[in-house]
Amino acid sequence: MTLAFQLAVFALIATSSILLISVPVVFASPDGWSSNKNVIFSGTSLWIGLVFLVGILNSLIS
């Protein structure tokens, strides 16, 4: 169970880092938002899901 928690935390940190870099780049590009809207929404949905997963796993571990 601890390994699953550690992997979920790592995935959350990796997703946060990717979104931290990619979202401003998409907004700064001339046609970025209209062409990459689905990718940003998918990444944000993944991030929200990982936040809940880490919270659930944390409550099971401690």
Swiss-Prot record:
UniProt-annotated location(s): Plastid, Chloroplast thylakoid membrane
Keywords for this protein: Chloroplast, Membrane, Photosynthesis, Photosystem II, Plastid, Reaction center, Thylakoid, Transmembrane, Transmembrane helix
InterPro entries: PSII_PsbZ (IPR002644), PSII_PsbZ_sf (IPR036512)
Main location: plastid
Any one GO CC term of the record: photosystem II reaction center
TM segment ranges: 8-28, 41-61
Top-rank taxon, per record: Eukaryota
Membrane topology: Multi-pass membrane protein
BP GO annotations: photosynthesis; photosystem II stabilization
Pfam short name (any one): Ycf9
Function: May control the interaction of photosystem II (PSII) cores with the light-harvesting antenna, regulates electron flow through the 2 photosystem reaction centers. PSII is a light-driven water plastoquinone oxidoreductase, using light energy to abstract electrons from H(2)O, generating a proton gradient subsequently used for ATP formation.
Family: Belongs to the PsbZ family.
Oligomer and partners: PSII is composed of 1 copy each of membrane proteins PsbA, PsbB, PsbC, PsbD, PsbE, PsbF, PsbH, PsbI, PsbJ, PsbK, PsbL, PsbM, PsbT, PsbY, PsbZ, Psb30/Ycf12, at least 3 peripheral proteins of the oxygen-evolving complex and a large number of cofactors. It forms dimeric complexes.
PANTHER family, per the entry: PHOTOSYSTEM II REACTION CENTER PROTEIN Z (PTHR34971:SF2)
Protein name: Photosystem II reaction center protein Z
Organism listed in the record: Coffea arabica (Arabian coffee)
Lineage of origin: Eukaryota, Viridiplantae, Streptophyta, Embryophyta, Tracheophyta
Gene name of this polypeptide: psbZ
